[in-house]
Amino acid sequence: MRTSRTGACALAIALTMLAPLAATAAEPKVFAMSIENGALHGAKDTLRVKQGDEVELRWTSDRPMTLHLHGYDIESKLAPGKPTAMAFKATIPGRFPVEVHGAGKGPHRPVLYLEVYP
């Protein structure tokens, strides 16, 4: 009986020590940004994360538009004043533009770049 009780205590201690590590690893990298008059506010023009990171890009805009994260093929439709998020796991290393689609005439243009490092 003593061995199983000791083993159970050791297991409980080990799980208690590992719990914070599991919680920390699952926390997403969150970036909050806004696009006002066609310009990016609240972030640098390049965001850097590590491959395997959970990422959340939170957006607001003063006009309707669609944002497209190339390489991951994620699109989000933004409405004025309504927060929108792109949530994904950064599985592909490289440099990827987030482009504005449908916010006026002319070619699509990047508002920022996402760099995913191995």
Residue spans of the language-model regions?
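N-terminal secretory signal peptides that target proteins for export/translocation
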Residues: 1-4
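Bacterial N-terminal signal peptides
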Residues: 10-20
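Sec/Tat signal peptide C-region and signal peptidase I cleavage site
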Residues: 21-25
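N-terminal edge beta-strand
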Residues: 26-54
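Extracellular/periplasmic metallocenter environments
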Residues: 28-29, 78-118
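N-terminal post-signal-peptidase region of extra-cytosolic proteins
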Residues: 37-47, 69-72, 81-85, 98
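Beta-strand cores of secreted/periplasmic/IMS beta-sandwich domains, seen most often
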Residues: 45-63, 85-91, 96
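Histidine- and aromatic-enriched segments that form or immediately flank copper-ligand environments
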Residues: 60-80, 109-114
